[in-house]
């Protein structure tokens, strides 16, 4: 089993953990429908950046 040779200081431990923070996902509001969706993703109605890119199943 691997054992560290020297104790890691609190500063180095903190630097090691600096990338472990949780990030809130970016949420956008569709200007045409007002629905929320993840950034760079299509809204549930099939709109992206103000344009309808997918047709709804009810319309097809």
From Swiss-Prot:
Which portions of the sequence form the region Disordered? 1-22, 34-60
Gene Ontology biological-process entries: translation
Swiss-Prot/TrEMBL keywords:
Ribonucleoprotein, Ribosomal protein
Gene Ontology CC: one annotated term: large ribosomal subunit
| GO MF annotation, one | structural constituent of ribosome
* Compositional bias of kind Basic residues: 9-19
- Organism superkingdom: Bacteria
What PANTHER family does its record include? 50S RIBOSOMAL PROTEIN L32, LARGE RIBOSOMAL SUBUNIT PROTEIN BL32
**Family under the similarity heading:** Belongs to the bacterial ribosomal protein bL32 family.
The name on file for this protein is Large ribosomal subunit protein bL32
The gene it comes from is: rpmF
């Amino acid at each position: 089993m691997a054992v560290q040779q020297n104790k890691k200081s609190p500063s180095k431990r903190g630097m090691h953990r600096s990338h472990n923070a949780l990030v809130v996902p970016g949420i956008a509001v569709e200007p045409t429908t007002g629905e929320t969706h993840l950034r760079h993703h299509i809204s549930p109605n099939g709109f992206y950046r103000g344009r309808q890119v997918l047709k709804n199943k009810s319309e097809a």
